[in-house]
């Protein structure tokens, strides 16, 4: 479809359309890592105002960035089976309304962070928002097959944001959590890119399977998964976590490697999408294990 429906008509949007613009499932996973960052940062407990309004501010800014992504990608979304029913692609929300909504979310999020956390958290969150909405969505996504590697730093920021919200300063520990998500991002997205290779090619998006082929991508997924396993052990190495986390990191990472190997071998028809799905469970469970282990250590 050469001309988007969203450029011809704008049926009245309902609240669910605006909620969809925020990519709520992605935001929830980001908030989990932000919460872990907060709780790991202090032994004394996180003030409820920081816990509630700090995470709400981060969520609003993330939702604003996601809404900008919908606007910029509306033509691409209309061409892909996974995204063609999104609000802008189907014309349920206009680009102007979506941008106004994104700006409102970002301003509200920044106001909450400045009021209830600290300026450093607000600045870092703003940098993450711009990194995703402008640098990744506006440029990198269409410019290079390494788009999600370079742009992955913005999406890896939530545990750092949570840590800084609770403490007011940066340190090595939250940067290690950022590194874990940074290493996780390529195998997570490239597995999906293999599954949706034809759609990305149709939309002219230079994802790695489109530009370099599936075998090359599978090799890199395997290599990044090995790197992720190694990086995920560093919290134990630097005594940030204990044995419980170590066991969980090894078990979860081993399973991720198993899926990456199955994908590489090409022995199962749905290995790519199953690897993608497992990667989501992996990140969620890894950070939960880190949090549980932290409180076990505090009570010893």
From Swiss-Prot:
The question of whether Cell membrane is a record keyword is answered with yes
Q: Biological process (GO) annotations?
A: heme O biosynthetic process
Signal peptide start-end: none
Transmembrane residue ranges? 26-46, 48-68, 97-117, 120-140, 148-168, 174-194, 226-246, 280-300
**Which Enzyme Commission numbers does its entry carry?**
2.5.1.141
Q: Please list the reactions this protein catalyses.
A: heme b + (2E,6E)-farnesyl diphosphate + H2O = Fe(II)-heme o + diphosphate
- PROSITE patterns hit by this protein: UBIA
Biochemical pathway: Porphyrin-containing compound metabolism; heme O biosynthesis; heme O from protoheme: step 1/1
- Major enzyme class: transferase
InterPro entries named in the record: Protohaem_IX_farnesylTrfase, UbiA_prenyltransferase, UbiA_prenylTrfase_CS, UbiA_sf
* CDD domains tied to this protein: PT_UbiA_Cox10
> Where is this chain primarily localised?
membrane
Q: Which GO terms describe its molecular function?
A: protoheme IX farnesyltransferase activity
Q: What does this protein do?
A: Converts heme B (protoheme IX) to heme O by substitution of the vinyl group on carbon 2 of heme B porphyrin ring with a hydroxyethyl farnesyl side group.
Name the family: Belongs to the UbiA prenyltransferase family. Protoheme IX farnesyltransferase subfamily.
The record makes one more remark, namely:
Carbon 2 of the heme B porphyrin ring is defined according to the Fischer nomenclature.
What PANTHER family does the entry give? 4-HYDROXYBENZOATE SOLANESYLTRANSFERASE, PROTOHEME IX FARNESYLTRANSFERASE, MITOCHONDRIAL
State the protein's name.
Protoheme IX farnesyltransferase 1
Say which species the protein is native to.
Pseudomonas fluorescens (strain ATCC BAA-477 / NRRL B-23932 / Pf-5)
Gene (name only):
cyoE1
